[in-house]
From Swiss-Prot:
GO terms for cellular component: cytoplasm; cytosol; nucleus. Disulfide bonds: none annotated. The modification Phosphohistidine is found at residue 68. InterPro entries: AHP1-5/YPD1, HPT_dom_sf, Sig_transdc_His_kin_Hpt_dom. It comes from the Eukaryota. GO terms for molecular function: histidine phosphotransfer kinase activity; protein histidine kinase binding. PROSITE patterns: HPT. This is Histidine-containing phosphotransfer protein 4. It comes from Arabidopsis thaliana (Mouse-ear cress). SUPFAM superfamilies: Histidine-containing phosphotransfer domain, HPT domain (SSF47226).
């Protein structure tokens, strides 16, 4: 599983390839398990952010904290497009730009969903 292929280019960076290098015969599903944990944790964060945004009064510090966690998780598996959206969202939080946060969060959810589908296909194809 050392080549993430063209369909994943732009979605995953070298961090994902480093995870693949840690996978061995003793733990053949390591990358898939790490990815599953990422999607479980990120679903929780998306839910928390959704709830915070639905309140209408924006707590930019709380939103930034959630997004900081999301960015860290995304960085750890090499989710480059999701990570980029996290960075943009945090910039809007620091600027107090609610509309920018809302717009970026929609794009982040789209990139996250696309990544999930691509990884599911990738793991199925590599079995």
């Amino acid at each position: 599983m050392t080549n993430i292929g063209k369909c994943m280019q732009g979605y995953l960076d070298e961090q994902f390839m480093e995870l693949e290098e840690l996978q061995d015969d003793a733990n053949p599903n390591f990358v898939e398990e790490v990815s599953a944990l990422y999607f479980k944790d990120s679903a929780r964060l998306i839910n928390n952010i959704d709830q915070a945004l639905e309140r209408g009064s924006f707590d930019f510090n709380r939103l930034d904290s959630y997004m900081h966690q999301f960015k860290g998780s995304s960085t750890s598996i090499g989710a480059s497009k999701v990570k980029a959206e996290c960075t943009t969202f945090r910039e809007y939080c620091r600027a107090g730009n609610a509309e920018g946060c809302l717009r970026t969060f929609q794009q982040l959810k789209k990139e996250h969903s696309t990544l999930r589908k691509k990884l599911e296909h990738y793991f199925q194809a590599s079995q």
